[in-house]
Amino acid sequence: MRVIVHLGEPFWRTAGRREVEVVLAEGATVADAFSALKQLHPALAAELDNDEAQPAIFVSDEEARLESPLREGEKIHVVWPVSGG
């Protein structure tokens, strides 16, 4: 199945593009999509695997986790969480 990973700031700058299509097996999860994404763009591994802060993940406009299942054609949004005061 194919899914689109939409990369927010700063991830898209590392990948050089805002959207990346990845091909996954049926029954794949967000973690599987991240693995495929890191194979296509190895420099993203350091940003996505950051122990200090994890990116916020949304699938079809709903908050998701790495173990969340995916369906054909879904869009995964990966954004950096921010806070302010």
Predicted regions and their residues:
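Ubiquitin-like/PB1-type beta-grasp interaction modules and other compact soluble beta-rich domains
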Residues: M1-G84
